[in-house]
Amino acid sequence: MQSLIQLEDITHLDRHPVEKSDELHVEWFIGKRCNYDCSYCHDLNHDNHSPHTDMTHIVNSIGKMFDRFQNKLQINFTGGEPTVHPEFGRLVDFLAECDINVSMTTNGTRKAEYYTDIYRAFNHITYSQHFEHAINDVFLPKMKYINEHRGERSMQIQVMYHAQHEDAVHEAIRYYEFHDIPYTVRRLRPTKNHKYPIQEAMHYSPEQLDNIKWFQASDTGHVPNVRVTAADQTHTVHTNELTGLGMRSFKGWMCLAGVNFIRVHDNLVYRCWGEFRTPIGDITDPDFQLLTEARPCIANKCVCAPEISTRKWRV
């Protein structure tokens, strides 16, 4: 990619394939409760005591969105750990009755059969492997079982490359490659975590950084998801290739976040994670409306693939 695209030439980003451009993508943070306590997880994203989100509000809000957007609605549930919500089964039953493109990110601690059952509600599940907690002897066979029983639904393992657990990381990658299980490799970044102010998980050696780049270039989970216009040419790539170029900040660009991309966190709606201090509404408000036009980005960086691939252009 570096031979095809120069960072300074990029003028426009949009989702790929093109039919996804007008979808409403919702990153839905279902709650901070989590059964893990990873040293590199942001304080805002996890704890073991926050109250659970009211599932009635979630179900009702999704129903209203579905009435408006129908098959143009795409939702990804995150946390915390979504499956620890005591009423998560109610959400699964509701989603299974709707024709909505729904995905979820989970730490994969439930039994394998649990996940193969809830695929009736989810088109895709991402299983994040956190090596401070997930033991290969347990986690790897579970992923193999799910891969063999998921039918036409899709999955992806997100291998969190922990600098202090390198042997386990490499063992997992070899296993996924041998058993043809889709995976991606994620480099850990510093976060605000009051319990772990010194975060050794991302104290990478130069060799480890080279390994991460090599794995990211050869892993099996990267499907092009963004169209990039650079020097009057259009390329389809994966967002990880853009972040590899150092492209995470679009401050000052015009962006459709708030129009066809939103984040829901504790019922408050945000354009994106970078504008977390400025909600644009409350998802439970019957009068809540999405924005109707692009606004300049005021965030310091995009934090995930759906944010990066939301339509934006340099001005």
Roles of regions detected by a PLM:
Residues 2-105, 109-114:
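Conserved alpha-helical substructure of the radical SAM core
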Residues 35, 82, 109-110, 132, ...:
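Short, solvent-exposed loop/turn segments at secondary-structure junctions
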Residues 190-315:
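Accessory C-terminal segments flanking Radical SAM cores
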Residues 124, 135-240:
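Conserved C-terminal portion of the radical SAM core fold
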Residues 46, 130, 188:
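Flexible loop residues that form catalytic
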Residues 38, 114, 135-137, 167-169, ...:
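Short acidic, gly/pro-rich beta-turn/loop elements at beta-sheet edges
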Residues 59-77, 85-176, 182:
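Radical SAM/AdoMet-radical enzyme domain recognition
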